[in-house]
Structures are given as structure tokens and as C-alpha cells.
């Protein structure tokens, strides 16, 4: 029985053309190891640094903000796929209703901004104080938006227990 489940998962991930798949706690060591794996798999030398920077930012968000924890580390899912010369980075984790609501408004606002407005807001945040609720400088999603080749996509799906399953997907050209 276990074989059937594993084979179905294997076959599914193979069809997805996944480059990297991880589900579990995101420790500093795991982040470092996943980054090294991705670094070895990216053949586009020109865009490698920005892809890796965005990947690290996305995975740190899972570690810091996931509602599910293993010790002090967040639990989530990380998936990297490649198709038609596009690299797709996706992360997913659970959020509380309050966090999901706040984050959804923030991301919608960021996506409504022009490139110049994103740059201006980014510079303001660099010069400003660190937000109290942030584990960083509050720049993460702006960094992701600035460095990715296309606008990111996000979704917030309510789970049966009232929390939200948050997914973030970012795209890069590989040519």
C-alpha cells in the first residue's frame, strides 16, 4: 500500500518537472542545503544571483511566519519547477486568519504599484525603522517583486480549521 502512494507522488512530481521539492521544517541548515542544490541546478549564470536571493527570501518567510512550527522553525512546502525556459519558485505554509488578512492586503497593494513606486517604497523602507512585527527589515516581498521577471502570484485558501494555506509563486526567465 505504501508503495502505491509513494509511486503516485513520484509520478506526479516527475510530471511537474520539479527541480526541487521539500516539505517540512525550514531550519538554517535546511535553507543552506536547499540553496546549494538550487545553485547547482540553475544553468542561467546571468540570473542566478537574483533567483537565489528571491529563493532565500521566500524560504525565510516560510521559516519565520508559518503558523505550524517545529521548535522555533516554520513548516512549509517548497517547490521549484522548470518548464518552457521558465523557472517557477513556489512556497506554501499555514497562516492565521489575522496574518493572512493583513498579508493579502499588503501583497495586493504591492502588486498595484508601478515599477517606480515599488522602487520608491523600497528606498523608504530601507531608510525607515524596522516594523515591530517583522523579523527582517520589512523588505522581503518588495525584494521579490523587484527581482522577479514577472509579478508574483499569491493565494490564501481557508482550511477546514479556519487557518489559511498561503502560496507564493515567483517566475524567472531562464534564457
Spell out what each predicted region is.
Residues 54-57, 75-77:
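Short, glycine/charge-rich beta-strand/loop segments that flank catalytic centers
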Residues 3-20, 65-175:
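Conserved beta-strand-loop-beta-strand hairpin that lines the nucleotide-binding pocket
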Amino acid at each position: 500500500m505504501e508503495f502505491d502512494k509513494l509511486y503516485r507522488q513520484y509520478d506526479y512530481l516527475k510530471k511537474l518537472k520539479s527541480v526541487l521539492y521539500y516539505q517540512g521544517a525550514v531550519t538554517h541548515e535546511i535553507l543552506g542545503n536547499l540553496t546549494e542544490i538550487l545553485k547547482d541546478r540553475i544553468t542561467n549564470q546571468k540570473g542566478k544571483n537574483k533567483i537565489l536571493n528571491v529563493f532565500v527570501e521566500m524560504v525565510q518567510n516560510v521559516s519565520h511566519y508559518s503558523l505550524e512550527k517545529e521548535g522555533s522553525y516554520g513548516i512549509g512546502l517548497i517547490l521549484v519547477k522548470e518548464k518552457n525556459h521558465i523557472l517557477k519558485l513556489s512556497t506554501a505554509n499555514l497562516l492565521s486568519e489575522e496574518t493572512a488578512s493583513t498579508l493579502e492586503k499588503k501583497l495586493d497593494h504591492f502588486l498595484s504599484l508601478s515599477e517606480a513606486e515599488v522602487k520608491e517604497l523600497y528606498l523608504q523602507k530601507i531608510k525607515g525603522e524596522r516594523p515591530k512585527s517583522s523579523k527582517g527589515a520589512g523588505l522581503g516581498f518588495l525584494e521579490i517583486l523587484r527581482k522577479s521577471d514577472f509579478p508574483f502570484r499569491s493565494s490564501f485558501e481557508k482550511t477546514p480549521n479556519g487557518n489559511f494555506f498561503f502560496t507564493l509563486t515567483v517566475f524567472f526567465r531562464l534564457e
